[in-house]
Amino acid sequence: MEGILFLAKLPEAYAIFKPIIDVAPVIPVFFLLLAFVWQAAVGFR
């Protein structure tokens, strides 16, 4: 919870990193999809 409050009060200097912070939680899902596509490509050996 403190992390959310910290991110809400980010200094202006870090404003350019805000899109990266917004996208960060989605990255593990992309890895999961990548693993599935890879297994489909090799035929689920």
Curated annotation (Swiss-Prot):
Spans through the membrane: 24-44
GO cellular component, one term: photosystem II reaction center
Pfam families for this protein: PsbK
GO terms, biological process: photosynthesis
Propeptide intervals in chain numbering: 1-8
Disulphide bridges, residue numbers: none
Binding partners and assembly: PSII is composed of 1 copy each of membrane proteins PsbA, PsbB, PsbC, PsbD, PsbE, PsbF, PsbH, PsbI, PsbJ, PsbK, PsbL, PsbM, PsbT, PsbX, PsbY, PsbZ, Psb30/Ycf12, at least 3 peripheral proteins of the oxygen-evolving complex and a large number of cofactors. It forms dimeric complexes.
Record's function text: One of the components of the core complex of photosystem II (PSII). PSII is a light-driven water:plastoquinone oxidoreductase that uses light energy to abstract electrons from H(2)O, generating O(2) and a proton gradient subsequently used for ATP formation. It consists of a core antenna complex that captures photons, and an electron transfer chain that converts photonic excitation into a charge separation.
Protein name: Photosystem II reaction center protein K
Lineage of the species this protein comes from: Eukaryota, Cryptophyceae, Pyrenomonadales, Geminigeraceae, Guillardia
